[in-house]
Swiss-Prot record:
Topology in membrane: Multi-pass membrane protein
Residues covered by region (Disordered): 900-977
Pfam families tied to this protein: UPF0182
Entry's Gene Ontology cellular component terms: extracellular region; plasma membrane
Transmembrane segment boundaries: 16-36, 61-81, 112-132, 174-194, 209-229, 258-278, 286-306
Protein name (record): UPF0182 protein Mjls_1469
Cell compartments where the protein resides: Cell membrane
Biased composition (Low complexity): 900-929
Family: Belongs to the UPF0182 family.
PANTHER family: UPF0182 PROTEIN SLL1060
InterPro entries: UPF0182 (IPR005372)
Amino acid sequence: MRPPARMPKLTRRSRVLIGVALAAVVLLLIGPRFIDTYVNWLWFGELGYRSVFTTVLFTRVVVFLVVSLLIGAIVFAGLALAYRTRPVFVPTAGPNDPIARYRTTVMARLRLFGFGVPAFIGILSGIVAQSYWVRIQLYLHGGEFGVTDPQFGLDLGFYAFDLPFYRLVLSYLFVATFLAFIANLLGHYLFGGIRLTGRNGALTRSARIQLVTLVGILILLKAFAYWLDRYELLSHTRGGKPFTGAGYTDINAVLPAKLILLAIAVICAVAVFSAIVLRDLRIPAIGVVLLLLSSLVVGAGWPLVVEQFSVKPNAAQKESEYISRSIAATRQAYGLTDEVVTYRDYPGNAPATAQQVAADRSTTSNIRVLDPNIVSPAFTQFQQGKNFYFFPEQLAMDRYRDADGNLRDYVVAARELNPDRLIDNQRDWINRHTVYTHGNGFIASPANTVRGIANDPNQNGGYPEFLASVVGANGNVVSPGPAPLDQPRIYFGPVIANTASDYAIVGENGTPREYDYENNVETRNYTYTGSGGVPIGNWLTRSLFAAKFAERNFLFSNVIGENSKILFNRDPADRVEAVAPWLTTDTTVYPAIVNKKIVWIVDGYTTLDNYPYSELTSLSSATADSNEVAVNRLALNKQVSYIRNSVKATVDAYDGTVTLYAQDETDPVLQAWMKVFPDTIKPKSEISPELQQHLRYPEDLFKVQRALLAKYHVDDPVTFFSTSDFWDVPLDPNPTASSFQPPYYIVAKDLAENNNSAAFQLTSAMNRFRRDFLAAYMSASSDPETYGKITVLTIPGQVNGPKLAFNAISTDTAVSQDLGVIGRDNQNRIRWGNLLTLPVGPGGLLYVAPVYASPGTSDAASTYPRLIRVAMFYNDQVGYGPTVRDALTDLFGAGADATATGPAPANLPDGQPAAQPPNGQQPAAQTPGNQAGRASTPPPAAIPSGPSGPQQLSEAKAAALQEVQEAMSGLQDAQRSGNFAEYGEALQRLDDAMNRYSEAR
């Protein structure tokens, strides 16, 4: 045997260069991670959730180290054993033996290969394993559900917390043993323990013992896997079955097969281990082949035979017991038990008189005519103020009580800063990050009314009534409603965070720098005084953030002083997910005024994907509807079989404070996480009454539940199997929609209490299976007293569903003719608002669809829509008019509108002349309807030119009055021109002038 050839040595310079290159690579890989880690440490500390950061980091590091050392040690043992038991003399196959060359290379770098390969595999395994920290923490802190599964009688906590951990450990042990087997096999082959030369080759005793032992361990691990497979059958779905969980075939064929395979695996393992003593590899080979054949015949073939010849011919009867299990488990897992859901029979098409409709005051006085998915451009046009302020494309719904204590729903929005709308010099780094730092204002519009009647698209009216709580021109907070507000400045929100670098640098450093508001004289600035923000007054933190954001101005700009702070991670949902990484958040957040502050309310869910017998649901599929598709805002593509709205979170819009409240304190998953992160979640009892008044039943949860109720309202397993009594979520009938109809937040009569009091609720119609007729009406209460109660009105017969109702409305002769005139020659774009379904009268359903018009055919934000008509449908009859009151009267007759809200009806009493339009304009065209004799609708009264009577005005007041008069003149010119866009701009100028007049002193 020739001595091994020496490897060429590197020069000192080469070694230095290689070392520098490796150090640079390591720095590039680790440096950003270190910076992010330290920045996150600062950020979590500023929020008061540093314990969350340290707990997660500690768990990840420990898991990484344990798995890396374990996997690396097992692989190292496989290599070390092969090396230490190598033959003393290894014959070669000649001078060109490739194995000899590889052997020489390895021997020359023995430490590199002996330690480097196991270390690399161990580190790689540790990196992957640390991502499973959630599963490990749930195993360590999970408790019991207090409910047992129907097959094995085990508490569901075993399936939720223990079984996933056991499967994780088994997977890593299997991978580690397999890698050790491969390493040992290659080691023996390389060092001569296995030789393939000659007729039969050669295998040393050490190689045989080691390889056989590893194969035996693998088979024993497979036996343990068969044992765990038994439990996982309960969350398994067999193809072609309408339910989830173990069915007849699984219980009577697959389950026994798993036990048989387990026994065979143990026998095969014994046979494999016997080769250690018997020195005959044929026995373990036969055992391995037997295990493979058994898995095919017993594990796959036998269940297939049972399924085809026993179950399928009698499926409804055979699967009946297991369908009942699935129905009960799914209802429990998704919060649809009888304690939560109340079913009531409801005619759906009962006749109603005008008096009966008017008696439903809680519903008729709150009929919603503002569609939050349409009116955002109107908010932008009338309430934007500056180019850099912005409203989201889809606004939110919430409720407040008016001065009389009546519950009313509002379209609400925060006037946020949108960095993407900054222009020219506003985009300069200093301006973007130190001047334009925050939004200003909470805007609310009553959802059941508009500011005037829009009898013609070129007349005034039809726009929302705005209640703007903002910093006024004198620096004081103007808060006309719907609730008192002390701090309208908004530093945190989804719009302001919708850019790559959403940070703002704030704090006292000389004169105020942040743009705040303007008056007639000057621009006034502001200095942030909130508790939120990471201090960046020292050079270390400035350097870190300069590296994080790749921005040198952190180092050289003098706008950063010793009291400066940086606000970043400003999206409310992202902040909640960061401090509660175990939560899945709702796709929508909404602003509310709580205790005189603006807060963002975020719904958080705890989920599982292995609840026994519960149906597995895709969140992205179940929550998709026409609203989500329109803005490409879909939930995570996450599979769940258990969900609870366990946490309500608030994010202060001014200082970013995140507060977590336990909403469902009985949730075992939440209880486990409260043990992992103690003192991070406040008990439900600490939710203030003011906040409780603004908690909504979460939309994503409701959509998941309605999708499941479409199937799991059925009690009888045979009927369930036939699918004959299933329901469907209706498609959105709006011509521009392309997905399911979204649920709608409304204020209407309380279905949970079954009385005529007003309640804020989330509602949805449900169709019959593959039909357009109604099957049910579903309502979830958001009122504190009945929060979470779901009422389902089951509707017999053939009552028109949303699509049929919309078709009847849109094809009605009077409706189509009127809208055809308004939209002629593409002068105006007609848009249908949300089609609401409202239970009214003694047992009927009223469909309400607002109609909007905007100039031209564009979807641009500048073409702001306004309400021009309201259409209704009840028992195959259509009502139509400029207002809710007109439509109710048209549909039910005189008196039906007695309790409705909104502008006075256009129908005037007999003998009363209609008011004439100002400035000599011609009256608008008469509105067609189902009843003749409708008079033209007068436009809103003109704004008075000024105070009446003798009055001595100050200089500022007189100047403001002159602006009002000029704005009124411009408004009249725009009215005569017939240009809708010019008219809107003129109206905005008049509004601004009136505001300045009222604030002038």
